[in-house]
């Protein structure tokens, strides 16, 4: 679902970007 995709993308962003 969209929520799952957003969660995965958010996790990747948090890993790539500090804070």
Curated annotation (Swiss-Prot):
GO biological process: defense response to bacterium; defense response to fungus; killing of cells of another organism
Tissues of expression: Expressed by the venom gland.
Cystine pairs: none
GO cellular component: extracellular region
Keywords per UniProt: Antibiotic, Antimicrobial, Fungicide, Secreted
Chief subcellular location: secreted
Protein localization: Secreted
Coiled coil: none
Known function: Has activity against Gram-positive bacteria and S.cerevisiae. Has non-hemolytic activity.
Family, as annotated: Belongs to the ponericin-G family.
Annotated protein name in UniProt: U1-poneritoxin-Ng3g
Organism: Neoponera goeldii
UniProt lineage: Eukaryota, Metazoa, Ecdysozoa, Arthropoda, Hexapoda
């Amino acid at each position: 679902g969209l929520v799952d995709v957003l969660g995965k993308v958010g996790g990747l962003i948090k890993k790539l970007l500090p804070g």
